[in-house]
């Protein structure tokens, strides 16, 4: 990682980060799904597997893995705060080049979900305090694939906990409504964003040892930008009670800036 020691705030014009490999190894790359604006997407995709020299020279997001035969190298970041996350772009040879989103100059909101997006960007990537550290760039080396999910370098290099007691945060497996778009077949009710559908999901999660069910977009009206008003088709307290009776907790999805603007009220409610 880099660090700077300055009494004045700084503007970071750009950063050069390149990862060059000794051979034309196979890369596992999750490419952006937005061809027009590749840095504006949901950071979720399947991995494309190609030799480095044949990999499309498009933006991919982290983590990226390169199979160096005797071991795999996974490129990661940690302690990423007030700085753009790194994308990588194959160079058509045997390297991956770091690419960084420019700093937003102007933003607007999508009217259908109150989600902020960039309309104009600056010609630099960050405005930062002069005395600070920058993200760790991690090369996690594993000899067996089973070692990847238990590698703790990201956690070990992160800043110490600043939120106090976090014992209420519990990991677990989830059932996700968007995975099949509420598209249930052969059920004695109309599938959709309603009580019957989510109770069906909760029953499935309970039978199969899933600790959580996610209520993704639609449990509040995204156009309103008000997560305190649940749609009339759902009785959220009753759904929470039903889930607890089955040993299943609920996770509520929301647009970040909606939660940020209503954080105190939402947590009290």
Task: Give the positions of each predicted feature.
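N-terminal accessory beta-strand-rich subdomains and adjacent acidic, glycine-rich linkers
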Residues: 1-156, 161
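An acidic-aromatic substrate-binding cleft motif
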Residues: 129-204, 208, 212
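Substrate-binding cleft of carbohydrate-active enzyme catalytic domains
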Residues: 174-269
């Amino acid at each position: 990682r880099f660090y700077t020691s300055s009494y004045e705030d700084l503007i970071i014009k750009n950063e050069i980060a390149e990862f060059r490999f000794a051979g034309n190894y196979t890369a596992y790359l999750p490419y952006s799904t937005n061809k027009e604006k590749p840095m504006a997407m949901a950071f979720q995709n399947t991995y494309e597997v190609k030799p480095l020299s044949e990999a499309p020279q498009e933006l991919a997001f982290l983590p990226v893995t390169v199979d160096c035969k005797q071991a795999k190298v996974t490129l990661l970041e940690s302690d990423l705060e007030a700085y753009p996350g790194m994308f990588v772009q194959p160079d058509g040879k045997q390297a991956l080049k770091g690419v960084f989103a420019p700093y937003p100059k102007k933003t607007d909101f999508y009217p259908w979900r109150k989600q902020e997006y960039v309309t104009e960007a600056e010609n630099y990537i960050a405005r930062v305090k002069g005395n600070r550290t920058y993200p760790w760039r991690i090369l996690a080396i594993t000899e067996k694939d089973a070692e990847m999910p238990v590698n703790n370098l990201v956690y070990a290099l992160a800043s110490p906990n600043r939120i106090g007691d976090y014992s209420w945060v519990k990991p677990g497996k989830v059932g996700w409504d968007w995975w099949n778009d509420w598209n249930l077949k052969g059920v004695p009710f109309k599938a959709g964003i309603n009580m019957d559908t989510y109770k069906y999901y909760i029953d499935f999660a309970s039978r199969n040892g899933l600790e959580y069910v996610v209520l993704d977009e639609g449990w509040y009206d995204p156009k309103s930008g008000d997560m305190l008003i649940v749609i009339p088709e759902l009785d959220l307290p009753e759904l929470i009670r039903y889930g607890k009776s089955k040993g299943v907790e609920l996770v509520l999805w929301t647009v970040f800036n909606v939660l940020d603007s209503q954080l105190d009220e939402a947590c009290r409610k």
